[in-house]
From Swiss-Prot:
Membrane topology category: Multi-pass membrane protein
NCBIfam families according to UniProt: nramp (TIGR01197), Nramp_1 (NF037982), PRK00701.1 (NF001923)
Alphabetical GO biological process terms: iron ion transmembrane transport
The family this protein is said to belong to: Belongs to the NRAMP family.
Source lineage: Bacteria, Pseudomonadati, Pseudomonadota, Gammaproteobacteria, Enterobacterales
Annotated protein name in UniProt: Divalent metal cation transporter MntH
PANTHER family: NATURAL RESISTANCE-ASSOCIATED MACROPHAGE PROTEIN 2, SOLUTE CARRIER PROTEIN FAMILY 11 MEMBER
Nucleotide-binding keyword on record: no
Superkingdom to which the source organism belongs: Bacteria
Listed transmembrane segments: 20-39, 52-71, 96-118, 126-145, 156-175, 197-220, 239-258, 277-297, 328-344, 351-370, 388-406
Length: 412
């Protein structure tokens, strides 16, 4: 009886610690459902129905492993990826890494900020510029939570992630997808045309986000409580739950687009405004409103995460710190310039995703090198199987993103 009580007490303590350590992966997972994912998944679903759902499944599994490695680096070393690169590589190399990471963080923020502004425009009927002003105000308010520590921000970001997931449960109910075809699309790989290959590369490029790789290692580097192995075990649960939710949202986005657009003959739906306007007569005004709200929630939360990632990148690479509100102000400027110049926001959004693809391998390669170093990682070093899987992901991501870049350059 005494042994049972001890085991029960230790079990409760383990669960309590696991819950206390949950949160960082929910911040990271927001990067996987930003407006870039909305645009890519909608286009893929409208064009090819359920045939590219398997790409979302595999991209999400890859992303899970990458985020676990990033989180593990922070737990094992007490330093984030940017700091490790700074400590192990020559200064010119570090400065190059910092510049490209900042450019990629700003490109990411551009897509996320404009995505949220489009969401406000759609649901409130305001101009894109007014939507951008509302986005700026909202992100400043959310970032103010950082003054109270990481936990309040984790709760808000996690809440927004769950809201987007709930919104897409509603969208699935409205669109009523064919479950048998949906399941087949998730399991059986299919690339029927060269455009499908191009869109598959786009889905992968929009899913694995370099700025989140840097950020996640910083979110776990100061975790306390329990042993390193216990913190790592709790983090794996954190990543599994958060990334499963993000994966569901991406699947639901594509499945909704397939059911609502592809099978009703609207295969050319390619941008967010068009998707919103097309949803109204096909499903209902309520479905279109839910879509707009989910776009706002995803855009706001992901642009906040992008700001935090930019801060980590600057602090880690060059040991320089600026207040978050200053960084937020500076990174908003390109979005306002794009809007004031009257450029096509969806095209800018897609171009930013292409730019992002340059940074994926640059973040992945050092992450794999560091997490495979037994002197650095100790008992948390990568196993042989994880190393091999990691390098396969690197090769695949680089190959598909080269395809994406070449296809974009040639106008394929």
């Amino acid at each position: 009886m005494t042994n049972y009580r001890v085991e029960s007490s230790s079990g409760r303590a383990a669960r309590k610690m696991r819950l206390a350590l949950m949160g960082p992966a929910f911040i990271a997972a927001i990067g996987y459902i930003d407006p870039g994912n909305f645009a890519t998944n909608i286009q893929a679903g409208a064009s090819f129905g359920y045939q590219l759902l398997w790409v979302v499944v595999w991209a999400n599994l890859m992303a899970m492993l990458i985020q676990i490695l990033s989180a593990k680096l922070g737990i094992a070393t007490g330093k984030n990826l940017a700091e490790q690169i700074r400590d192990h590589y020559p200064r010119p190399f570090v400065w190059f890494y910092w510049v490209q990471a900042e450019i990629i963080a700003m490109a990411t923020d551009l897509a996320e900020f404009i995505g949220a502004a489009i969401g406000f425009k759609l649901i409130l009927g305001v101009s894109l510029l007014q939507g951008a002003v509302l986005t700026g105000i909202a992100t400043f308010l959310i970032l103010m939570l950082q003054r109270r520590g990481q936990k309040p921000l984790e709760k808000v970001i996690g809440g927004l992630l769950l809201f987007v997931a709930a919104a897409y449960i509603v969208e699935l109910i409205f669109s009523q997808p064919n479950l048998a075809q949906l399941g087949k699309g998730m399991v059986i790989p299919s690339l029927p045309t060269s455009e499908a290959v191009f869109l598959a590369a786009g889905v992968l490029g929009a899913t694995i986000m370099p700025h989140v790789i840097y950020l996640h290692s910083s979110l776990t580097q100061h975790l306390h409580g329990g042993s390193r192995q216990q913190r790592y075990s709790a983090t794996k649960w954190d990543v599994a739950i958060a990334m499963t939710i993000a994966g569901f949202v991406n699947l639901a986005m594509m499945a909704t687009a397939a059911a609502a657009f592809h099978f009703s003959g609207h295969t050319g739906v390619a941008d967010l405004d068009e998707a919103y306007l097309t949803l109204q007569p096909l499903l209902s005004h309520a479905a279109a409103t839910v879509f707009g709200l989910s776009l706002v929630a995803a855009g706001l939360s992901s642009t906040v995460v992008g700001t935090l990632a930019g801060q980590v990148v600057m602090q880690g690479f060059i040991r320089f710190h600026i207040p978050l509100w200053v960084r937020r102000t500076v990174t908003m400027l390109p979005s306002f310039i794009v809007i004031l110049m009257g450029l096509d926001p969806t095209r800018i959004l897609v171009m930013s995703q292409v730019l992002l693809s340059f940074g994926i391998a640059l973040a992945l390669v050092p992450l794999l090198i560091f997490t495979s170093d037994s002197k650095l990682m100790g008992d948390l070093v990568n196993s042989k199987r994880v190393k091999q899987t990691g390098w396969v992901i690197v090769v695949l991501v680089v190959a598909l993103n080269i395809w994406l870049l070449v296809g974009t350059a040639l106008g394929l």
